[in-house]
Design a protein with these regions (language model features):
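Acidic, low-complexity, intrinsically disordered peripheral segments
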Residues: 7-14, 67-75, 79-87, 422-459
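Regulatory alphaC helix of protein kinase catalytic domains
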Residues: 10-26
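Periplasmic alpha-helical coiled-coil/stalk elements that build and connect Gram-negative outer-membrane
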Residues: 20, 50, 153, 157-271, ...
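Small/polar-residue-enriched beta-strand and adjacent coil segments characteristic
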Residues: 21, 60-74, 78-157, 280-356
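Short loop-to-helix capping motifs
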Residues: 29-35, 245, 274-278
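Alpha-helical heptad-repeat coiled-coil segments that mediate oligomerization/polymerization in large
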Residues: 207, 360, 367, 402-406
C-alpha cells in the first residue's frame, strides 16, 4: 500500500470512526465490561447469601401431615386347637363323657384368616428454636459477611485493573497513530527526495551509488511506515474491543504530561494503605479465619434448644413441648488441635497483611519513581527534538547550496521522525506510569483529574 492509498484509507476510517474522549471511553467500558459485570454479580451473590443467613438461629416453624390406608391379614392355624378339643373329653369323668358323646361338638376349620383394614389422616405443627448454640450462628453470619467483603474487594481490584487496561489501550492507540503519522510523513518526504535523486542521477549531478543509497533509504522508510500502520491498526482494534465498539475508535484525548512533579510519595503510600483493595481482601480473609475459629470454639460449648409439636385437630389434641440440652463431653476429634489450627490461620492472615502492606508500599514507590523518571525524560528530550529540527533545516539549505547530499537530508528527516516518535513514547511512558501509580494507590478513578491538570499535550 502506497503513502497516498494509506492516507485515503485513514481518512475514510476517521470519518466512520467513533470519536471518544477518555472519560467517554471509560464510561462506555464501565457499562459494557464483562469483567466488571462478573465482579458485580459475584458481589451481589455474596450479599444475597449474607442476607439469607441474617436470621440464622431464629425459630423454625413447620407443618406436617400424612394420610394413610392399610390392609392387614393374619392367617391362624386351628389344627392344634381342634386336637386339644378332641382330647378334652377323655380327661372328663365317665358320666360327663357319656353326656358329651351324645352332644355333637362342632368341628373348627383347619385355619382362619383375620383381616383388618382402615384409612386415616394426621397433621401437626412443630417449632424448634435454638436458644443457645455457643456462638455458632454468629460465626456463620460473620463468615458469610466476610466473604461478601472479599468479593467487594475483588470487584474494586477489577475496577482498577480495567481502568489501567483502558489507559494502556487508549493512549497506546494514540501513540501508535502518532507514530504511523510521523512515519507516513517521513515516507512522503523521502519519496520526494528519492524522485529528486533520480533526476539528479539523470543530470549527472550524483553518482549511481548515491542514487542507490537514496532508494534504499526510501524502501526502509516504506517498511517503517507499513509496520507503523499495522501497529496502529492493531492498537485500534484492541481499543475498540475494550470499549465494545462495533467499528474503529478515534481517541480524542491526546497524550499528556504534567511538567511539574505531582504529589509527594507519602501521599500515595498513605492512600494505598487505606484504599488498596488488596488490603481489603486480606482483611476479609482474616475476618473469615477469625469466624472459623469462633465456629470451632462454639462446638465446645453447650447447646440449648426449645421445641414443641401439636396435632392439628379439634378437641383433645396431643401436644408436647420442652427444652433440649446437648453438651459434648468427649469427642474422638481433637478439638484442641482444630482450635489451634484455626488460630494459626488468623495469625497467617495477620502476617499476610503485614507483608502486603510492605509490598504495596514498595510498589507505590517504584511506580512513583517511574513516573517522575518518565517526566524528566520527556522534558530532557526537548533539546533532542530541537536539534533534529535544526539539522533538517541545515541539510535542506545545504542541499540547495550544494554542501549537503540528498542522503544527508534523508538521514536528517528520518532521525527527526525517530526523535519525535521517541518523545511521544516518553509521553506515553508517563501516562502509563501514572495509571500504574494510581492503581497501586487505589486511586484509579482520579486519573481524569490528572488529565485536567496537564500542561503539556502531545498532539
Amino acid at each position: 500500500m502506497g503513502a497516498a492509498a494509506f492516507a485515503q484509507q485513514q481518512a475514510r476510517g476517521d470519518a466512520n470512526a467513533l470519536a471518544l474522549s477518555f472519560d467517554a471511553a471509560r464510561l462506555r467500558m464501565v457499562e459494557r465490561s464483562d469483567k466488571l459485570a462478573a465482579a458485580r454479580i459475584a458481589v451481589e451473590a455474596k450479599e444475597l447469601q449474607s442476607e439469607g443467613v441474617k436470621r440464622l438461629g431464629g425459630p423454625v416453624v413447620s407443618i406436617s401431615g400424612l394420610a394413610y390406608a392399610y390392609n392387614a391379614n393374619l392367617n391362624l392355624d386351628l389344627d392344634p386347637l381342634n386336637q386339644k378339643l378332641g382330647q378334652i373329653g377323655s380327661s372328663l369323668p365317665p358320666s360327663i363323657q357319656g353326656f358329651i358323646s351324645r352332644v355333637p361338638i362342632p368341628q373348627l376349620p383347619n385355619s382362619y384368616t383375620l383381616n383388618r383394614h382402615d384409612t386415616g389422616a394426621n397433621a401437626s405443627v412443630s417449632a424448634v428454636w435454638p436458644l443457645y448454640l455457643g456462638g455458632a450462628t454468629d460465626a456463620v453470619r460473620g463468615f458469610v459477611s466476610a466473604q461478601a467483603r472479599e468479593a467487594q474487594a475483588d470487584a474494586e481490584q477489577a475496577g482498577h485493573e480495567v481502568d489501567t487496561l483502558l489507559v494502556q489501550r487508549y493512549f497506546g492507540a494514540q501513540l501508535a497513530q502518532r507514530a504511523a503519522t510521523l512515519r507516513l510523513q517521513a515516507e512522503r518526504t523521502i519519496a520526494q527526495h528519492d524522485a529528486a535523486a533520480q533526476k539528479m542521477l539523470a543530470a549527472g549531478v550524483i553518482s549511481r551509488v548515491e542514487r542507490l543509497q537514496a532508494s534504499a533509504a526510501y524502501e526502509e522508510a516504506r517498511r517503517n511506515a507499513r509496520k507503523a500502520e499495522n501497529d496502529a491498526a492493531l492498537a485500534g482494534v484492541a481499543l475498540a474491543r475494550t470499549v465494545r465498539a462495533e467499528g474503529s475508535v478515534t481517541p480524542q484525548t491526546p497524550l499528556f504530561l504534567i511538567s511539574a512533579p505531582i504529589e509527594p510519595l507519602g501521599h500515595f503510600i498513605d492512600a494505598a494503605l487505606t484504599r488498596h483493595p488488596g488490603l481489603g481482601k486480606v482483611a476479609a480473609k482474616k475476618a473469615q479465619a477469625e469466624q472459623l475459629h469462633e465456629g470451632e470454639e462454639a462446638l465446645r460449648r453447650p447447646q440449648v434448644i426449645a421445641f414443641g409439636t401439636r396435632e392439628i385437630k379439634s378437641g383433645n389434641a396431643d401436644w408436647v413441648a420442652g427444652l433440649g440440652v446437648r453438651w459434648t463431653l468427649y469427642d474422638s476429634v481433637d478439638r484442641n488441635a482444630l482450635s489451634a489450627a484455626s488460630h494459626k490461620q488468623v495469625e497467617q492472615a495477620e502476617r499476610t497483611d503485614l507483608q502486603a502492606r510492605s509490598d504495596i508500599s514498595l510498589l507505590v514507590e517504584r511506580n512513583w519513581r517511574a513516573l517522575d523518571n518518565a517526566r524528566r525524560q520527556y522534558l530532557e528530550m526537548k533539546v533532542s527534538v530541537e536539534l533534529a529540527q535544526e539539522v533538517v533545516k541545515l541539510r535542506t539549505a545545504g542541499l540547495r547550496e550544494g554542501t549537503s547530499t540528498t542522503l544527508d537530508l534523508i538521514d536528517a528527516e528520518t532521525n527527526q521522525a525517530k526523535v519525535l516518535t521517541e518523545r511521544a513514547q516518553a509521553a506515553n511512558d508517563y501516562v502509563q506510569a501514572l495509571a500504574q501509580l494510581l492503581e497501586s494507590a487505589g486511586l484509579s478513578e482520579t486519573f481524569s483529574d490528572y488529565i485536567a491538570r496537564a500542561d503539556v499535550k502531545v498532539n
